[in-house]
Amino acid sequence: MSLSDNFADSLISAPPIRVICLVGPTGAGKTAAALHLARTFGGGVVNADSRQVYRDFPVITAQPSPEERAVCPHLLYGFLPSTEKISAGVWTDKATVVIEELCREEPGHNTSRQATSRPDGLVPLLVGGTGLYLKTLLDGIADIPRVDPAIGARLERECDALGAPALHARLASIDPDYAARIHPNDRQRAVRALEVHEGTGHALSWWHARPVPRPRYAALRIGMDMSLDELTPRLDRRIDLMLEAGALDEARAARTVCDDPAAPGWSGIGCAELYRYLTGELPWAEARLLWLRNTRAYAKRQLTWFRADKRIHWVRPDDLDAMAALACAFLRGETAE
């Protein structure tokens, strides 16, 4: 039995731990909001972004800077090599452990916690735009049976031969709901969804809709309220800032560690486009345009996912006082979520 299994068992009769989630599309200001709440209440940040787990791409995936990390503990950022896959289940196991660690940790000198009824320990702040990760952690997810690894290996070979868009098209005919949530070039998720369907006889979205155990956390969900039209110029500017911060050099260095475009770490938006530029597949103007276009499309999918969750409190990213008021009431137990 793993440490996370032991922890989950211990929560069966315990009151749920209160966590705060900051969600929304990429580039909307989740990091700044998290740092404000961390300073206000004494919090620690847990990454809930599937691309920010990769250590070779801190700039391109917009991981918090060293200065931002100095404000409070930041967990589950940049801990995986580019060659290693991660799933919602694996992330949930790791997040379960670090949330427990935060609940035992004392606030540092950079925080000035407002009075709440919360016991000692840091407030877990789950920050990111990977909706499935948060759904798996907070709502639970059906226990998908183990699939024969040979199926996944064969699908990986097919992806090498045909390309990720071909597998995505196949997935769309089998599981249109899940296919609509992922990018056509998202090799890892397309292969996983096809693998589950072939190995279990059911689509991944069918498994995700199965009844699940009682949630282990009470969660306040705060969404960054920004339209796609507002977000687009911010995303364009953010690409410029990433380039100024060394995104191209970062991609060149990452190739010396892993020069396989099919590796999970290279699947992130920005990473894939820069790889194609560095290998001469795309001219610079086309690579940058594709980077922005794919980022915008991803933000649109994120907005669709999160807008469907009626538990989310939508707040303008610059209205930090409103976020703090929601968090204060939640931590005092005045609101359920």
Curated annotation (Swiss-Prot):
Q: What's its top-level EC category?
A: transferase
| Residues engaged in binding ATP | G24, P25, T26, G27, A28, G29, K30, T31
Q: Which reaction does it catalyse?
A: adenosine(37) in tRNA + dimethylallyl diphosphate = N(6)-dimethylallyladenosine(37) in tRNA + diphosphate
Which GO terms fall under biological process for this protein? tRNA modification
Region (Interaction with substrate tRNA) spans which residues?
49-52, 188-192
Quote the EC number.
Answer: 2.5.1.75
What the entry lists under SUPFAM superfamilies is as follows: P-loop containing nucleoside triphosphate hydrolases
The molecular function terms in GO held by this entry are: ATP binding; tRNA dimethylallyltransferase activity
Which InterPro entries does this chain map to? Dimethylallyltransferase, IPT, P-loop_NTPase
Q: Where does substrate bind?
A: T26, G27, A28, G29, K30, T31
Say which family it is in.
Belongs to the IPP transferase family.
Q: What does this protein do?
A: Catalyzes the transfer of a dimethylallyl group onto the adenine at position 37 in tRNAs that read codons beginning with uridine, leading to the formation of N6-(dimethylallyl)adenosine (i(6)A).
Under what name is this protein listed? Answer: tRNA dimethylallyltransferase
Q: Which organism is it from?
A: Nitratidesulfovibrio vulgaris (strain DSM 19637 / Miyazaki F)
